[in-house]
Amino acid sequence: MATGRAKNTKWARWLSTAGLIIVVTLPATTMAAERTGLKATAWKPLCKLTTELSKVSGEMLNKGQEVISNIQKIKAAEYKVSIYLAKNPETQALQQSTLLRGYFARKTNGGLESYKTMGLATQIRSARAAAYLKGSIDEFLNLLESLKGGSENKCLVTTNADTAATRRETKLDDQECALSMPETKPEAATRTELTQTGYPNLQHGGGGTANTFQPTTSTGTCKLLSGHSTNGYPTTSALDTTAKVLAGYMTIPNTQVEATLANMQAMGNGHKATAPAWHEAWEARNREAKAKDLAYTNETGNLDTQPTLKALVKTLLLPKDNTEHNAEATKLEALFGGLAADKTKTYLDMVDAEIIPAGIAGRTTEAPLGKIHDTVELGDILSNYEMIAAQNVVTLKKNLDAVSKKQQTESAENKEKICNAAKDNQKACENLKEKGCVFNTESNKCELKKDVKEKLEKESKETEGKDEKANTTGSNSFLIHKAPLLLAFLLF
């Protein structure tokens, strides 16, 4: 019996020793990963995302310039048609050209208004949201990267707890990861990390003991990623709740499990409450104004499907009380010989072929309008032709006044001749009463009434005075009757 007891006691001691050894060595081999650093599989996608986000402000600047460039192209087209009309006031394509000029003017004004009130705001919103999210990511990654020293403190690791990520200028290990905001330059960019659906390359999950994003516990630790009161950053007392970092992407637990990464791959309305910064950057990205938007480009398709052109026809060419069905389409078809989209090409080609000679607006060589694209130069050319047109109006007005003066002078002389032809025949003179004739009993001859003669002479002098002063503010009705083509020119 004694021998048996001794053996049992010895066996018990051996088991106790073995158990102690297992307990002592267990943390180094199988303890949960709640206090180790963040694996590269988790932080590298964040680096890719923050690198992409750093380019959004430059991308928005580039998109804004593209929008303005598109509007300028439409403005250039408006200038060209206006120049053609100013240069060719008697063109047979007056209505078609005027309609096209009005279309381009509406598109230009509408595009500027749309960009001023809506488009620009969407681009600024996207740049702002991207910068805010990038700041949240950069701040925490920078903190994790900085928390290292010796063999124990490592918060950004590669694949195991003891190998910290190494910074080489703008890279962490082999991954571009500049935690700063670069200079804003207008550049196009490709979106791969923040797409129309969300953040497809970000990891998600964790929250257990499977070492998904934090490696097995070893010498290297990162207590910042654990809210456990024994193994994490709290002292003695447990935390009331879990901690949210990275703008809601990561949850640091207050139990002995690893951190949890939220699913940001497919964004939706639910993220607006749980991760507002991520939701805002995603939503803003999908609402950015782009140069290809209809507000900033020419309309396409059949003429009767182009809203701007139809609205212009209704305003300019149809009676206000028109109730005819498809009246706009009927008018467009009559003007352009059909409704196909290319029916305006004939008139636009005619405008582009118009030659602007050397000497106009400082040009040293002649060129067709189709080869001139700068809006400043086109504006100068239009101003030049408008000045020529204004001078032509002054010259024509003077010529018309001279003709009127001559006609009035001849009228007075002719009337006086008619009266004088009656000579001393009083009865014949009385028959010319309606012509302004009166019989002078003293001189015994038929004469033009004194007041009629004075009136005609006065009108003649007034006309002569206006001609000398080059007065260009005379009756428009006079010009309308005398120069209908000039009036048409002035209207355009």
Curated annotation (Swiss-Prot):
Single GO cellular component term: plasma membrane
Signal in keyword set: yes
Protein's job: VSG forms a coat on the surface of the parasite. The trypanosome evades the immune response of the host by expressing a series of antigenically distinct VSGs from an estimated 1000 VSG genes.
Keywords: Cell membrane, Disulfide bond, Glycoprotein, GPI-anchor, Lipoprotein, Membrane, Signal, Trypanosomiasis
Covalent lipid sites (GPI-anchor amidated serine): S475
Residues of the propeptide: 476-492
Organism domain of life: Eukaryota
UniProt key word Magnesium: no
Gene3D superfamilies: Variant Surface Glycoprotein, subunit A domain 1 (3.90.150.10), Variant Surface Glycoprotein, subunit A, domain 2 (1.10.470.10)
Signal peptide as annotated in the record: 1-32
Location in or out of the cell: Cell membrane
The species this protein was found in: Trypanosoma brucei brucei
Gene Ontology BP, a term: symbiont-mediated evasion of host immune response
The name this protein goes by in its record: Variant surface glycoprotein MITAT 1.1
Topological relation to the membrane, as annotated: Lipid-anchor; GPI-anchor
Known glycosylation sites: N298, N471
Cystine crosslinks: C47-C177, C155-C222
